Amino acid sequence: MKVVIQRVSQAQVAIEEQIVGQIKQGFMVLVGIHQEDTPEDVAYVVGKISKLRVFEDDEGKMNRSIQEIEGSILSISQFTLYAKTKKGNRPSFIEAARPDVAIPLYELFNQQLEAEGIAVATGEFGADMQVSLTNDGPVTIVIDTREK
């Protein structure tokens, strides 16, 4: 599982020009599911995201988690995180999980974040989405369970 986490002051996702998810302060998370991912990978990433201390405390240091600031997450499925570009110019997505594997794990990911007390907004799995956000920092962090 690979996620790209961006600290944002706001973010939203639209499908066919209709806003389907939006948040204020928190994270916009791009979520890629690998063909070999398991619920254990989901739990690992959720644990990292929920405790990641990248929000400023009273002294201006990155020392607070999304839970501590009562922030939200905009979760966007993103199979292209598993693009391979070694050969040729057209990316291969062979390592990305097929929808029958990816959808349940993506839903589990969002459910586990909510179980941690974090409000989660989402796009729609497999849809053509327009995502907009205001980076805060910017702070961008990548977590890949293949590298833990």
From Swiss-Prot:
InterPro entries: Daa-tRNA_deacyls_DTD (IPR003732), DTD-like_sf (IPR023509). A motif (Gly-cisPro motif, important for rejection of L-amino acids) lies at residues 137-138. It is an enzyme of class 3 (hydrolase). GO terms for molecular function: D-tyrosyl-tRNA(Tyr) deacylase activity; Gly-tRNA(Ala) deacylase activity; Ser(Gly)-tRNA(Ala) hydrolase activity; tRNA binding. It comes from the Bacteria. GO terms for cellular component: cytoplasm. Its EC number is 3.1.1.96. Keywords: Cytoplasm, Hydrolase, RNA-binding, tRNA-binding. One of its GO terms (biological process) is D-amino acid catabolic process. It is found in: Cytoplasm. SUPFAM superfamilies: DTD-like. Its main location: cytoplasm. It catalyses: glycyl-tRNA(Ala) + H2O = tRNA(Ala) + glycine + H(+); a D-aminoacyl-tRNA + H2O = a tRNA + a D-alpha-amino acid + H(+). Gene3D superfamilies: D-tyrosyl-tRNA(Tyr) deacylase. Belongs to the DTD family. A Gly-cisPro motif from one monomer fits into the active site of the other monomer to allow specific chiral rejection of L-amino acids. An aminoacyl-tRNA editing enzyme that deacylates mischarged D-aminoacyl-tRNAs. Also deacylates mischarged glycyl-tRNA(Ala), protecting cells against glycine mischarging by AlaRS. Acts via tRNA-based rather than protein-based catalysis; rejects L-amino acids rather than detecting D-amino acids in the active site. By recycling D-aminoacyl-tRNA to D-amino acids and free tRNA molecules, this enzyme counteracts the toxicity associated with the formation of D-aminoacyl-tRNA entities in vivo and helps enforce protein L-homochirality. PANTHER family: D-AMINOACYL-TRNA DEACYLASE 1 (PTHR10472:SF5), D-TYROSYL-TRNA TYR DEACYLASE (PTHR10472). NCBIfam families: D-aminoacyl-tRNA deacylase. Homodimer. This is D-aminoacyl-tRNA deacylase. It comes from Enterococcus faecalis (strain ATCC 700802 / V583).
